[in-house]
A protein has these predicted regions:
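Short hydrophobic beta-strand that contains or immediately precedes a catalytic carboxylate
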Residues: 62-67, 80-83
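A short, well-structured juxtamembrane/interface segment
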Residues: 41-55
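Rhodanese-like catalytic fold shared by cysteine-dependent sulfurtransferases
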Residues: 14-43, 73-77, 81-83, 88-178
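Short Gly/charged-rich anion-binding patches and loops
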Residues: 51, 67, 131
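Cleavable N-terminal signal peptides
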Residues: 2-3, 13
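Short, solvent-exposed loop/turn elements at domain surfaces
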Residues: 54, 71-74
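Short coil/turn segments at beta-strand junctions that form active-site/ligand-binding loops
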Residues: 59-64, 100-103
């Protein structure tokens, strides 16, 4: 029986070793291990809208939005910091969140209804919250909490802003007609 089990798992182990050997900078088995560990940790870190608001007001808390800069500029939770998911790396995290113990609140497209342009829905299994949580966990950030519910943006208690609201419009050039 043991011999059969070893024969069945040998090709899988060999395929994983070959994948890492082809490109040691890409480690799917390692990612899956971290994702499973992060999933267990995440279970107790999903917040209601009220909890998210309360925690966001406490000193030293950062709200992180990992959507693209374009979508962030269209609309985001007031006071959020933008670090687009593709840019999450050692150096960008050191700049944005230098202290790994900083309480970090995250949210994504799939948390909001009623604003499809700035918050386009993704497949539930491809939710940006999941990817962001796993990435932060993988980089050693453990004080991360996630907005849990699907919130109607028109009924939300959260404060939102856009880049145009956050910054004054530049003065218009004056036209002189002679």
């Amino acid at each position: 029986m043991l011999a059969v089990a070893l024969l069945c798992t040998a090709p899988l182990a060999s395929a994983q070793q070959n994948a890492v050997a082809l490109n040691p900078a890409i480690d799917m088995p390692g990612y899956l291990r971290v994702a499973a560990e992060a999933a267990k940790y995440r279970e107790t870190r999903r917040l209601s809208e009220d909890e998210f608001i309360r925690m966001s007001r406490e000193p030293g808390t950062v709200i992180l939005d990992a959507r693209s800069r374009e979508k962030f500029d269209e609309l985001h939770i007031k006071g959020a910091l933008n670090l687009s998911f593709p840019d999450i790396a050692v150096d960008s995290l050191k700049n944005a969140l230098p202290d790994k113990s900083t309480r970090t609140l995250i949210y994504c497209n799939n948390n909001f209804l009623g604003a499809e342009k700035p918050f386009p829905s993704k497949m539930a299994s491809a939710s940006l919250n999941i990817s962001t949580y796993i990435a932060l966990y993988n980089y050693g950030y453990r004080n991360v909490y996630e907005l849990g519910p699907l919130v109607d943006i028109k009924a939300s208690k959260l404060d939102f802003e856009s880049a145009t609201e956050a910054k004054p419009n530049p003065p218009r050039p004056q036209l002189f007609l002679f």
